[in-house]
Amino acid sequence: MVHVVVIGAYGSAGSAVADELAGEAGVELTLMDDGDPGGGLCILRGCMPSKEVLSAGAHRFQARHDDRLVGGLPEVDLERTVERKDDNTLGWAGHRREAVHDLAEREGVEFVHDTATFVDDHTVRAGGREFDADYVVVATGSSVDVPDLPGLGQVDYMTSADVLDAAELPDTGLVMGFGYAGMELVPYLSEAGGMDLTVVEHDDRPIGEADPAFGDAVLALYEEHFDVTIPTNCYEQHIEPTDDGGVRLHVEFDDGSTDAFEADQLFLFTGRRPGLEGLGLENTPVTPDAYTGESQDWVRDTMQARDDDRTFVVGDVNGKEPFLHVAKEQGFTAAENILRHDRGAALREYENVHHHVVFSGLGVYPFARVGHSEESAREAGYDVAVATRQASDDGVFKAKDVPEGLAKLVVDREDGTVLGWQGMHYHADVMAKTLQVVVELGLDVREIPDRAYHPTTPEILDGLVRECTEAVEK
């Protein structure tokens, strides 16, 4: 009998491991989680509740930009928005907990609702008991990454979780962090909260994974359509409280010049770090890499810890790619590899195609990337053919009153294989699924039908396909 302990069973990664191993012949499974209520970050404080509140802001944004509508502009009722968000997310979290508890009803499966700590290599303490395991799966998620900024301890700040619970907001704000959370919540604070915001951007533009035109499009969209100012190539130096209860952030630019911004409230959207605190890894051979904000290497692609073949680390906690679909797939890989390792078989390495979506522009103008960007394809040595189209090139986007944005398709000029796609426009989040199929199957652009129903937004894909096909056939 092989005993597997899963720490963090309520989350997406941990529950994926549990679901795969529960009922497996010869496996004893102990699931542990101290969540109250449990349900995982995505459901409780991440991707699901954020879409709840963004949708309220999106409706107002679209009404504000449609001059065919008359009468007063509706306001977003923040209290009602938060109440509905809470009702729905608690329901979704309840389904996750019930699924885990149902697994624990199976023979050979136990659930312990308590904090888990390593006692030694493969002994875990939880619920006043010690469990000796053959394999331990760590799926403890992530926590807010609070930057080491002088003066930060002297001022009040709000994180993304605080924003999702906010029934009232001040007039002005300073934002540190313009990654996924910042790009989603900044327009929400502006549109739904009526705030005037200054957002610090360290680079020339946001969305470092995208080709430059997409980050430039986001900058233009936010500064032209929301009450948002985004100083670029700008770095925080220190922060201090103001006499009236606000905050003053001192910054320095790449050219050496300095400035100071003041606002009523500071918002920290500065990312998340692996949730390792209190886990007791110091009692094991496992030594995580120092956190830098970059992808980490202390966990192999087999999902085994670099320092211990019998400890598997999945989801946000491994510091690789903090996305739900990746966490689940890593969980499936870990479960499979535990069984393979136990019987002495070769292990499978987890590989995934780049597939990211940012719900920028309140989700009205989301950014998505599947596979390569033009830049990454060229860096990988491909001779590429590239097509770029503005959303406004296709009449349907104008007809639907969503004319902003663009899309790009990248193919291998030699054999026509579609290498990647990027979109920052209406329905780009939906089209990402189509491109996932195309890219992961390695389809030849010349074999893709260029016929969407007219008039529908995927006509932008037809144009990209035609242009790349012509380039390959030259």
Language-model features, listed with the residues they occupy:
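Hydrophobic Val/Ile/Leu positions in short beta-strands of Rossmann-like dinucleotide-binding domains
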Residues: 6-7, 31, 174-175, 199, ...
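FAD-site-proximal beta/loop scaffold in flavoenzymes
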Residues: 154-170, 262-337, 434
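Glycine-rich flavin
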Residues: 2, 9, 16, 20-147, ...
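Active-site lid/adjacent beta-loop-alpha segment flanking the redox-cofactor pocket in flavoenzymes
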Residues: 213, 292-383
